[in-house]
Amino acid sequence: MKDSLKRRRYMIVRDQYEGFHKYEDAPAEVAFLKYRHRHMFKWTAKIEVFHDNRELEFYMVKDVIKKEIMPFVVMLDNLGSCEQQAERILDGLLNAYGPDRYYSVIVSEDGENDGEIEWNPDR
């Protein structure tokens, strides 16, 4: 028997975008990060869904992120840290789909180093 109260379901969508950033306060050991440099930023969004036939559709969610959210993520000359970019994506998801579901957004530099932010409606 399924204990549906204990099960949580999620959809996961991914994509990437080209961007530039710099870390102006970089420690001396990584001083090269103080200068503007390019990455392929890869993002992953994990979104809670409320039944096993998903009320959200992969393609539609990805389209909302690409068309309505990403312009605000990449509009800056310095995109900031992966965590700052993830925060902007999360803010867009909260605006699009509401605060009553769990979200996790991960942004990576070239698929190597990640920053993650979560929204947990249970806290």
Where are the language model's segments positioned?
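Charge-rich, low-complexity N-terminal segments
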Residues: 1-123
